[in-house]
Amino acid sequence: ERLKAKLYAGMAMHGITEEVADEIYARIQAFASFGFAESHAISFALLVYASSWLKLHYPGAFLAGLLRAQPMGFYSPQSLVADARRHGVEVRRPDIAVSGVDADLEQLAVVEGLGAGESGAAVIAPGGMDSCRAADQPKVERFRRGSPDRSAEHRRDGGAAVRLGLTSVNGIGRTLAERIVAERERQPYADMNDVVRRAGLTVAQTEALATAGAFDTFGLSRRQALWNAGYVDSLDTLPGTAVDAAPPELPGMSDVELTLADLWATKISPGEHPISHLRGALEEQGIRPVGSLGEPDDTRRVRVAGLVTHRQRPGTAGGVTFLNLEDETGMLNIVCSEPMWKRYRRIGRQSNGLVIRGRVEYADGVTNLVADRFDPLAAVLPQSAATVARSTSRDFH
């Protein structure tokens, strides 16, 4: 409306008046009612298509880019890594000998544990299909949960793994990470004490790197590295006063302990999803993996278990609350009616690990679970308490 007079004046200068001018204005006005939303939809669709193409063909590079851009977006680094791992991307822990400041790609031939400063054979076989680069593509088939995953056929960076950066470690900021990398490029680190001395680490920073497995490259287990963290020279000790004490024979960490250590140090478990360690016990109780649900389960009542990644209650949803539940097989949308949420609100909000009972809804390739009961995962499986305590969620955003 603010431009109406100016528009009519301009049209009059070009001989467009009366009914013709009114018709042009009416059409512009009608388009304005949805043109803003349409332009946003088109620009967003382009971003979605480009992102989807990259995720399919270069999932390793796509993951590394997302990790470099943190904090951002809907999904946590843990969920991003878990999804990439399910699609065949190898994710490696921080390594003081090879990690950069941020997450990056490295050749699969660079094997962990080679020793500080060493590198493996650098050979990357070409991957993917040339037809993927053609402008004209066949129609995409309808998605069905549980159908064979053929994404590996399209992957073009299959010879690369994602290496977590040093900034992913708790307490290691960008300035310190840059100093660690700069010192390493000047001269490879000889041992753990050399890293601490040259990079100027505190005991807390050394312990965080040890917990993350960053010193594994020196042939140390995580417990040995943690023991050594209290003896090496650091900013917390007087120069030359550290005791050169060999660590005692310490038992290695179990797979569960390694996962918990990863989560504490980086909030990411690159090896295994935390719920995978509980799968046997869950199956004994008839609790199914979320990735096993699909069209054949439509309307069935089932129980699933996992870690809550999101809680949302949109103002336009009529009181319905939505949760995302994740286990080692994938994510599941949980739909909670207003009465159900009121009944289980305390458990639903306070427990990051849940066992959820409900009925499956399957439509257009999307599986939802309409929940009718919550139980804390730690109450059903007490051994899960430490895992649940390490998990976090993003709520009501």
Predicted regions and their residues:
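Noncatalytic, beta-rich nucleic-acid-contacting surfaces in large DNA/RNA-processing enzymes
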Residues: 1-397
